């Protein structure tokens, strides 16, 4: 079999950041100036190519940071993906706390090339939120994607963005935690299963789905912008797919993709060698059936 690498690149120079996800952890209440606030840890995980085909090649380590995410107030209770533009209420700096060189699981049925040097970097920051009954969005973006991506129309000029929805603070929700490494290597002509396993610390019901990856508002002229201010334009722009590709058919009509909505188990088949973008979203429902969180990962 030939070799297929499923990747996403968001480095300012392109070609070295190949994936990631954005989440959060509820810490508890704190008193600030006599007012009760709700404290959260914001967690950004990135996966960086440190091989010879990266830019820069043979990267020593991912950037130190801080990276900056925006905190925006949601405007419609019960509709976390609806509403109008979201007002910026704060910016949080995310500092790198851990870097690990990882070895992703590689398929045994095809030859793997040079793209097996990968750094996992974890960035964290803390934010105190006011009580509201609509929730908040955490937003982070970067440009540009790898120009070799097959299933996007103009990948080299499109950015990548993450948006995580935090339910109303009284819920005290933490986002699901992915337990696998989202760097899937596939063999052309061979169907491969990827777990996308996540554990929810609150015991919420998780529903998995394929979605359009976010492109955001960054671009080649502004590859690492500060969070949009004064508002986050809503909805966040998605990528522009190439002809014949979409969220449900990321490998085209001749390919195959499947996701189990209850478990996150995915299966992929591609008839062609190339770099492809896939996004998986997790929606959290509490025991009352209310949406309390939305997160996603880009592969």
Q: What residue ranges belong to the model's regions?
A:
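Generic detector of short alpha-helix boundary/capping microenvironments
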Residues: 2-3, 177
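Cleavable N-terminal signal peptides
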Residues: 1-2, 12
């Amino acid at each position: 079999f030939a070799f297929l690498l499923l990747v996403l690149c968001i480095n300012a120079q392109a070609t070295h950041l190949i994936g990631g996800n954005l989440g959060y952890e509820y810490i508890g209440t704190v008193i600030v100036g006599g007012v009760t606030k709700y404290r959260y840890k914001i967690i950004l995980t990135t996966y960086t190519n440190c091989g010879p085909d990266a830019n820069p090649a043979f990267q020593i380590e991912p950037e130190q940071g801080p990276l900056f995410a925006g905190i925006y107030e949601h405007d419609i209770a019960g509709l976390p993906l609806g509403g109008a533009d979201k007002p910026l209420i704060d910016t949080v700096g995310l500092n790198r706390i851990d870097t690990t060189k990882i070895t992703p699981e590689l398929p045994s049925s095809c030859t793997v090339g040079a793209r097996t040097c990968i750094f996992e970097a974890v960035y964290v920051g803390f934010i105190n939120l006011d009580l509201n009954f609509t929730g908040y969005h955490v937003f982070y973006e970067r440009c540009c994607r790898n120009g070799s991506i097959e299933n996007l129309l103009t990948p080299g000029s499109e950015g990548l963005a993450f948006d995580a929805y935090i339910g109303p603070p009284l819920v005290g929700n933490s986002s699901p935690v992915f337990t696998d490494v989202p760097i899937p290597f596939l063999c052309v002509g061979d169907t491969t299963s990827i777990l996308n396993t996540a554990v929810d610390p609150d015991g919420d019901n998780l529903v998995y789905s394929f979605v359009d990856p976010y492109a955001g508002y960054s671009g080649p002229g502004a590859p690492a912008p500060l969070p949009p201010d004064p508002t986050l334009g809503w909805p966040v722009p998605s990528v522009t797919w190439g002809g014949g590709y979409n969220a449900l058919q990321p490998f085209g009509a001749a390919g195959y993709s499947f996701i189990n909505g209850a478990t996150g188990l995915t299966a992929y088949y591609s008839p062609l060698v190339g770099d492809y973008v896939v996004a998986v979203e997790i929606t959290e429902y509490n025991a009352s059936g209310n949406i309390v969180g939305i997160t996603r990962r880009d592969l």
